[in-house]
């Protein structure tokens, strides 16, 4: 299958050619896209391009660019831009695209939020950082209101991801030619399926065809697993009720993970985090790393694989 790729930015000539793309993305992972472009202009204003947005268009040139089954976009903010080297009469440039929320990694603060749910806290963090809230979609239970939530000498990105992980909330990104949207959800069925066939053919490592077809396929798949815990228990102490310690537990089995202090004020707060903590510390953690030739496979997390499948071009 032949693929075509284009780099879309006002400062890059339209006749510029995409030489290579390296993209990594996944559930609850900030996408990271490296693009190398060649063009005849030796003097692109790279400094002015930093923090501006760009898009990579990738797909099958045999179909219209408006066909979502055969074309996809990766849209993001340019965090790095550099001149690489001359290439004959052309010039090589490299650009790195990241989501707009990745800028929170450079904002380290200490503050206390009072009488707010965790989702309210995350909304405030995003709004204070100047993130366009139209590019953030929340589809999750806000949870109980907390007396206080503390951010202590912590980047706003780590602070936000820490609380999302604590509550079992995941996120992913949806891309178009002009923007990208961050979806934050605690529901397993909120993803759209991949475009085209709902299932992809899997080829073994020994397949001489390499698993390449016009419909796309998955190849070089391996299975890995890690041992964790099958039971979680936690306790905490509150000075207001010293004779009534807080406690919560989940799961059954002998491989217990015990946490003290649990950092929750009521049994209900501890209980609300039980399912996510138990899944996070699950005794068996399977994954199926592999490679794919399907353009739509890495569009979102809606494929039928129950593990993580890194897709590389």
Please describe what each predicted stretch is.
Residues 1-313:
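Amphipathic alpha-helical and helix-coil boundary elements used as assembly
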């Amino acid at each position: 299958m032949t693929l075509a790729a284009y780099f879309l930015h006002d400062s890059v000539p339209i006749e510029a050619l995409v030489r290579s793309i390296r993209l990594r993305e996944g559930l609850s992972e900030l996408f990271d896209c490296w693009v190398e472009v060649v063009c005849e202009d030796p003097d692109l204003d790279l400094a002015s391009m930093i923090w501006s947005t760009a898009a990579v268009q990738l797909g099958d040139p045999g179909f219209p660019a408006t066909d979502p089954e055969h074309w996809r976009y990766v849209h993001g903010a340019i965090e790095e831009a550099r001149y690489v080297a001359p290439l004959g009469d052309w010039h090589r440039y490299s650009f790195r695209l990241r989501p707009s929320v990745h800028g929170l990694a450079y904002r380290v603060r200490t503050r206390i939020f009072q009488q707010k749910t965790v989702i309210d806290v995350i909304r405030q963090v995003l709004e204070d950082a100047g993130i366009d809230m139209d590019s953030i979609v929340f589809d999750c239970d806000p949870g109980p209101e907390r007396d206080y939530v503390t951010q202590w000498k912590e980047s706003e990105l780590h602070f936000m991801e820490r609380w999302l992980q604590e509550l079992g909330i995941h996120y992913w990104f949806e891309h178009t030619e002009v923007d990208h949207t961050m979806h934050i959800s605690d529901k397993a069925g909120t993803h759209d399926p991949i475009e085209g066939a709902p299932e992809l053919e899997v080829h073994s490592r020994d397949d001489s065809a390499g698993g390449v077809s016009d419909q796309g396929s998955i190849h070089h798949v391996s299975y890995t697993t890690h041992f964790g815990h099958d039971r979680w228990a936690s306790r905490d102490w509150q000075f207001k009720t010293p004779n009534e310690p807080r406690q919560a537990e989940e799961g059954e089995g002998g491989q217990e993970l015990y946490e003290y202090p649990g950092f929750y004020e009521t049994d209900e707060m501890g209980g609300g985090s039980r399912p996510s903590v138990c899944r996070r510390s699950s005794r068996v953690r399977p994954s199926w790393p592999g490679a794919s030739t399907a353009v739509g496979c890495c569009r979102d997390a809606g494929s039928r694989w129950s593990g993580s499948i890194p897709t590389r071009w």
